[in-house]
């Protein structure tokens, strides 16, 4: 397992998708984690485990995103729309799981297995979006075929 050397925030940490993010962090990275769990004011103070560490949930509305390098957003389009630009303006790269930014031309739509190499070209904090789950699964399956035959359209 790799050590996690990034400061990370999980927005929507108390929800189902937020918990999956935490599980992935726990299962794929060892050692101490500089992790900030963010949710609504009503969840503030709640303790959540990730690996052998306990983390206190913080109020998203007052969080200083300059404290983290990457924020995973999984709290819905409205929350992403309000807080993702704020995070970027404070120097944090956002990986957004909502539909909010999927159709924005200047925001990359990334599936790591398909076009993750695009991330190597990014130097400044930005918002990164991902497609919905069925699109992602389809494109992961089509990628090896595209590499051989250059698929230009899927109907």
Name each model-derived stretch:
Residues 1-155:
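N-terminal Rossmann-like NAD(P) cofactor-binding subdomain of oxidoreductases
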């Amino acid at each position: 397992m790799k050590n996690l050397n990034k400061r990370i925030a999980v927005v929507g940490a108390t929800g189902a998708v937020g918990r999956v993010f935490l599980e992935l962090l726990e299962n794929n990275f060892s050692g101490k984690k500089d992790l900030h769990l963010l949710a609504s004011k009503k969840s503030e103070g709640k303790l959540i485990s990730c690996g052998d560490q306990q983390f206190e949930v913080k109020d998203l509305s007052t969080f200083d995103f300059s404290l983290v390098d990457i924020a995973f957003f999984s709290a819905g389009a409205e929350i992403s729309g309000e807080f993702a630009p704020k995070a970027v303006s404070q120097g944090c790269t956002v990986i957004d799981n909502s539909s909010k930014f999927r159709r924005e031309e200047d925001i990359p739509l990334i599936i790591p297995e398909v076009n993750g190499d695009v991330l190597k070209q990014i130097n400044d904090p930005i918002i990164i979006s991902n497609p919905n789950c069925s699109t992602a699964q389809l494109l992961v399956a089509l990628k090896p075929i595209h590499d051989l035959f250059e698929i230009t359209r899927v109907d």
